[in-house]
Amino acid sequence: ARLPVLLVTHGAGGSAEAHCQLWARIVSERAILLCVRGRARGPNPADGEYYPDHPTLERETFAALSALRARYAARIADGGVYYAGFSQGATMGALMLVEHAEEVKRLVLVEGGFAEWSVARARAFRERGGERVLFVCGRKECADSARKSAYYFKLAGVPAQLEYVNGAGHSHDARVEARVVAALPWLTASDARFEPR
């Protein structure tokens, strides 16, 4: 079966592998994952990775997506791409993805990307083809700001939802993962490419 693509980005100090494993559990073989690696933060792999800036992440993400489409065209379903970002990956996604909403239509922004929106940017996201935005927060600071951003999206005609995992902090822990799993039917609503588990 052909499957939709899910772009996955990590936070500073995180790794592409860890977030690929996380999202593989969440989507349970219902999407093709493309996990974008950052630069090494130091000589020790335990130092993790980071993205230098959003134009670099944008360039590398869409080059990787083009390569994936060229190599695995027979396995990729037509239609919009999903984007899941944590922390730095979420913030940079919010900065770069409005211009790519004709291709990347549904976003999951976890503990980042919550303060980069306005009604005008939300409207531009919708006008270019954006369909849904899920904010996930573990801190009050994130949740307060994401609540405003979700309201901006609703004003612009884009379904948006906030999942606040009170007490989880700046993490993508098991509680956050469980909340994302629970919200997945909302995120993928009306997308026939996502078969129920």
Model regions and ranges:
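Gly/Ala-rich beta-loop-alpha elbow adjacent to hydrolase catalytic centers
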Residues: 85-89, 93
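A conserved short beta-strand
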Residues: 103-114
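The feature captures the conserved acid-bearing segment of alpha/beta-hydrolase catalytic domains
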Residues: 112-185
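Serine-hydrolase catalytic machinery in alpha/beta-hydrolase-like enzymes
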Residues: 3-76
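Alpha/beta-hydrolase fold nucleophile elbow
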Residues: 74-86
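Alpha/beta-hydrolase-fold serine-hydrolase catalytic core, especially in secreted/extracellular enzymes
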Residues: 156-158, 188-197
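Conserved hydrolase catalytic core segment
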Residues: 95-105
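Alpha/beta-hydrolase-fold catalytic nucleophile elbow
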Residues: 37, 84, 110-111, 136
